[in-house]
Each structure stands twice: as C-alpha cells, then as structure tokens.
Amino acid sequence: LGNIDAMPYMYSGADHFMAVWSSDLGDEIKEAAGEASGFKLMGGAYRGPRVVTATKKMETIDDFKGFKLRVPNLEVYLKTWQWLNTSPTPLAMNEVYTALQQNTVEGQENPFADSLNYSFDEVCKYWIKTNHVYSCNLFMMDRTYFNSLPEEIQNAVIEAAEYAGQEISAVQKQRDQEAEQKVLDEGCEVIEVDTKAFADYFDTFA
C-alpha cells in the first residue's frame, strides 16, 4: 500500500484524495492490499500533501536538478526524485535535522505539520508546496480476528473506522493550515509552484 499511495501526482488535491478513498475504488484497494498482507484495512485518514522544505529557494522543475533531498527508503520515493533529476538520499528521520545543518542534504519532504513537528523551520527557510503525494493513514486489524467477529460487530468496526478517518482528516487539514501560518510568522518563505507543470512532467512516470 505504501508504494501505491506514494505515486506522485496521483491526486489533483485533497477533495480528489478523499473522494477516492471513500469510494468503491478505495474499498477495492483496501481489500486487495489487506488480503495480501493479512490485515483488514478500514477507514482512510488524510495526512496532508507532502511539501519540500529546503535550505535554498526553488520554484521550477529545473531548480530541482542535483538537489540533495532526504527521502524515505522506499523504491517509489527514490524513483520519483530520480525522475526529477535530484540526488535523493535515504536517511532515518532522526538524522535529517543534523544532515540539514551540515548540508549533507539540502531538503526533505513531508506534510506541513509533520515537518514543523521535526522543527525543520529552524534549518529550512524555504517551504515549497509541490504537493506531490497525498498520503493515507488506515486502521488495521488482524484479518483472521476480524473475520471471526459477528457480522454486526464487523459492521460497527468498519463504521467507526470510517467516522474516525473523516474526523482525523478534518483535524489534519486544520493542522496543516496552522503549520503553514506558523512558518510564515517565523520568517520562512512558502513558495507556490506550478503543480500542473510538475504533474505533467510525471505523466509518463510508472
């Protein structure tokens, strides 16, 4: 599911993301991934779009060439940023702050609120709204145990997960808005890029 969810520019925005994960298609994805992993996957909570925080200003696709970016150690993330001609570097999150201080990397990418939680506003002046990935958090239960429950309990669990996902999504949207305002108040620069140009650039990415 991590590789599916991490495909760049799969969603046009938050509304599209929520529409997919609350649709029959979203249910099919959860069922297929859950069956393969031995879990019952339920709900769907918005994590916010991933943005790039950087030590230097970047506004266009060309600006990313050679950019030293920390990425999660997942194949799809590495290929995404290689496609953009950056220099992706897998690092554990607890190493990223120091790596940014020492210029081992020049940036990292995560949702706004998550990036602020790691205090990247202290080492990254530029926050670039690439919005390249919208991530989904799901509720999981052991599939065998779930299937052993009475049908009415199964339905109640699914309903609770759906409700919780909607509530978490609303809170996350608010957290991202507050985080963006906080970094602006602290003197960081939030850069709006042409996300359509980026999405078009990834049109043949697979």
Identify the role of each PLM range:
Residues 1-16, 25-27, 31-206:
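N-terminal secretory/targeting leader peptides
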